[in-house]
């Protein structure tokens, strides 16, 4: 529930996490959303001739994030403490008044699992695979997704070539424009929040 739901239902004892997000996190997998085509229902985008399957990473991002609101000037830092005792600290931002903050994460193991599931699904369904992030802005976070997909693709490239299907990476804003212009018929792999939207 959100704050409004808490007011509507006073029997709620706390703002529980999303049940769907909790289940997806436990499964640590990929959600594939493939449309069901019905002749009498036409797509809103007239040039879509084939279905577009959304492959959504089912772990992390804002769904496992923490956030807070602060009321005064100050600075926010992010610190990682390794089991070895090593610490890494980054300045998030200095602010001159009230601010809202959010810290998100993802695990490399989960990103790899997501990439493999996407490549295998593309092979199983014989469809091209598109993947999009915003690594020009989130250079480390989204850059890790891009890097992992590139590394994992090496294991699937020969099979993709054999089937005549392709793997394509682009920035998410470019991907949206391309999707609208496309005829469909591919899998679009998205990070957790992007796939939700």
Where in this protein do the model-derived segments appear?
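Structured catalytic/translocation cores of nucleotide/phosphate-coupled proteins
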Residues: 21, 60, 79, 84, ...
